[in-house]
Design a protein with these regions (language model features):
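Glycine-centered recognition micro-motifs in short, flexible terminal segments and loops
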Residues: 1-25
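N-terminal helix-rich module
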Residues: 2, 21, 25-55, 59, ...
Length: 165
């Protein structure tokens, strides 16, 4: 008798059914993983920009400012980093752009304590508030975990998880 090698239709259907069940169980976790990774990526992008601004202010010996491209405290549309040689906190004709931060894709939103943050030549915040925070959240997931980027008085930047409002 000749034995054929391969799978029967029944065996194939059972394997496909098991694969479908496993995929449905893994899909929500994968979606959360993608959201979390995207949020972490955006937070790290701002963190790098803030650290660059701090190091440039020390290196150049002048004030370096980051300002939101919108006129309010929303940083979702992106930001500009420039050497602030003119009017402090205002980008004018004498200020050269150092770096531009990209806009954040929805549903992520980023708000800051103000629309301008700067570093003095010593590397500390200018003007000196107690702390400066950015809140990174998903607009369609209130009460979920987001990222909070905090700048201390000394200019040190840190990222922590927090509950979005």
């Amino acid at each position: 008798m000749i034995r054929s090698k391969g799978f029967t239709l029944t065996e194939l259907l059972i394997v496909l059914a098991l694969a479908a069940i496993l995929a449905t169980l893994a899909a929500p976790n994968f979606r959360d993983f993608v959201r979390s990774t995207r949020m972490t990526s955006e937070a790290n992008s701002l963190l790098l920009g803030l650290n660059l601004a701090r190091s440039e202010s020390v290196k150049r010996g002048q004030r370096i400012t980051l300002s939101s491209t919108s006129t309010n405290t929303s940083w979702t549309e992106g930001w500009d980093m420039y050497d602030d040689t003119g009017v402090a906190g205002t980008k004018d004709g004498t200020d050269a752009t150092i770096r531009v931060g990209e806009a954040i894709d929805p549903p992520l939103t980023m708000t800051g304590a103000a629309n301008v943050v700067g570093y003095q030549p010593s590397g500390v915040l200018a003007p000196v508030p107690a702390v400066f925070t950015f809140d990174l959240c998903e607009s369609d997931r209130n009460g979920e975990t987001g990222r909070q980027i905090t700048i201390s008085v000394t200019g040190r930047v840190s990222i922590a998880d927090f509950l979005c409002p």
